[in-house]
Amino acid sequence: MSTPLRGSSPQVSFYESELDQEGGSDASHFTYRNYMEDDKINSFTFNMARKDQTQLFQRIILTNESESEIEEYAEVAEQLLDAINLREKYVFHPKIWKADAPVGEKPPYSPFESDESTNCATEHMFKEVNGVYFVYSNETDMKSNKALFSVPHTLASYYKDINNLMMLSSYGPAKTFTFKRLQLLESKFNMHTLLNDSLELFQQKTAPHRDFYNVRKVDTHVHHSSSMNQKHLLKFIKRKLKENPNEIVIFRDDKYLTLAEVFKSLNLDVDELSVDTLDVHADNNTFHRFDKFNLKYNPCGQSRLREIFLKTDNLIKGKYLAEISKEVFTDLESSKYQCAEYRLSIYGRKMSEWDTLASWIVDNDLFSTKVRWLIQVPRLYDVYRETSTTTFQDFLNNVFHPLFEVTKDPSSHPKLHLFLQQVVGIDCVDDESKFEKKFTEKFPVPGEWSSEHNPPYTYYLYYLYANLYTLNQFREEKGLNILTLRPHSGEAGEVDHMGAAFYLAHGINHGINLRKTPVLQYLYYLTQIGIAMSPLSNNSLFLTYNRNPFPAFFARGLNVSISTDDPLQFHYTKEPLMEEYSIATQVWRLSVCDICEIARNSVLQSGFEHNVKSHWLGPDYANSGGNDIKKTNISDIRVCFRNETLIEELHLILKSLQTLPNFKNLNINFLLDKLPSEITTGNDYKLKKAQLKLNGANKLRNSSVGSTPNNGTPSSSGTPSLSSPGAIVHLMKTKPYIPPPLSLNIKQENNNNNNNNNNNNNNNNNNNTNTNTNSNSTTTNQDDNSKSDK
């Protein structure tokens, strides 16, 4: 049906849908009213802006889906569900940390004061077994190997799961199914914006004192040593040369050098310094050359300047980096609505790195309500092997042993205990384009890995994940905050990097290689894994801006945000995050609602505390479809569209699974938790959900679930009416679309339903009567399309 929103005719026709509940949730039905008058359209538009009403807008609803296609892709749906269920078993599901804290912008802790309730030492013991740390209640339990916590999967089973996932990603029917669904998702979004952009903009204008500039946005992926822009660094260096030229800053060539002597030895004059001589900005020579890009961290091409100005562990104990960090914090706080999650490095060369880094944070009072920290672990075991780490286990010990030690007894590392209050996650970084040995379950355990070759990405990620898993359980038991795994993944290299991250990570950075594998991309969509993308960074290193998949990912509904990565190398302005947003908006023609949605995604992906997110996004931010337009400036229509589209995709998976003969033995817990109760209100699904919660059994009776026919009254057979042959897409102004409850053999049941109705209406039933009834039904559908839309 065409909907002439503009034109010479003053009349606009659309459908408004109301959901009435009669006889309980199992007897829900729809009634439609067709408005053709201008005055009623105005009142409808006014109602659209009311927060207390269900959102009404033009929806795209597909009808007459082919049952043969649903059956054809049932096997694919089962494999997709298996992958999702495996992720649910792998990934650590944290409890909401201090959820009872009052809603506010400040975190529920004092940054440099420890909580007495979590500051006491306990009798817990821990030890490393085959590369993974395990925690025990006491020494007796440790001797008898009675660990408190365990890791869900071993290295061997992990690699088998990765292999299966890679086989699924190259499976023909799976690629066809997921590619079609992703294309349909993108087309749906384009149609939605075409039909409803003016309504979304109208809703945004009704939000008082709110626009894109004053909604919270988090830079979820930025490296701290390059958090300032090149002009800022240049001014800071010049200022230090003028104010403190005689300060001793480095020990080189068996003598101590002052700042002025360092520049003199490099033949650099303060008056001749410029952005060009600083030479820290990425250029054409860095494209596909990560080695040359790493050299850009050296101001003027000199490693000693990097050590003086951009390192925390140096002769002056990171004094200059702390000072410039405070200036960056001041810029963030002056902007008020911009926040950042900075990466600090732990290399795994020695255990004292943690205490050194924590002392730098605490001694310099580096804290801001706008900043949280992540620890990045570079994959450089092969570099340090000859000096400090003889096996990969030494590397893991240097990274994790201090964390378990401070969790057991905070007084053993008091500054580290305070610093960890502000740390929200672990990152894994390095050049993904390097060649690496293919993964196999026959890899040696870390204690036996003494090879000169670096372990592959998947090996690193598993042992970071496994040790974080037991550490988080330990910290959660003691009432401490937990650390999530959010690695770099999919910037370059093989697609198995993103497969490993799908199972193990809470979110990823970059992810541009998802464009190469529709199966993984669809899985990331269904599970809504956060993806922090950096288009300007990719443009200088691996992928030109016009080829970046960000706009496609966003349109399809993936949980994507925009981040800066390295402002020192890629940006020019004092507000690099706003620079990213402005370029993306202009190049990809994003609307105000689009960029506000991206900003909201960045807050959801971030590690800021629950009470802080509630203050920024509203108390319902964690609920499905929850939105407070007064805080997010996102139209309720947009949030409703995203939520309904995801529900429809999950519902399609469930419908496909229902055609399988072993459906009653499948674990559909994930789908039952994500889908609204209106879809799973039938007795069969109530029974199955109850049994899943009680004993894990999956039982489903082979009977259809009650539904609603088009005439607004409950059907005697409990099946939906499909009396609209040929109809493919209907544009409707409706309340949220709720797919009908599932039923088996819909076509056959529908025919039986029509025959039963004919028998009830006419005792002298014959073939002519049936023909007339079908003809009348078709005529009725032509007169009132509202009866064929469901």
UniProtKB/Swiss-Prot annotation:
Record: residues binding substrate: 223, 292-297, 491, 566-569
Gene deletion effect: Cells grow normally until development occurs. Then they make a significantly increased proportion of prestalk cells, and develop fruiting bodies with short thick stalks and glassy sori with less than 5% normal spores. They have an increased content of pstA-type prestalk cells. Intracellular levels of inosine increase dramatically during development. This is cell autonomous, as the presence of equal numbers of wild-type cells does not alter the cell type proportion nor improve sporulation. Overexpression of the gene has no apparent effect on development.
Transmembrane segments: none
Binding residues for Zn(2+): 221, 223, 488, 565
Region of interest (Disordered), residue spans: 1-26, 698-726, 739-790
Domain of life: Eukaryota
CC per GO annotation: cytoplasm; cytosol
Similarity-based family: Belongs to the metallo-dependent hydrolases superfamily. Adenosine and AMP deaminases family.
Function of the molecule: Catalyzes the conversion of adenosine monophosphate (AMP) to inosine monophosphate (IMP) and ammonia (NH4(+)). Participates in the regulation of the adenylated nucleotide pool and the interconversion to guanylated nucleotides during early morphodifferentiation.
Stated name of the protein: AMP deaminase
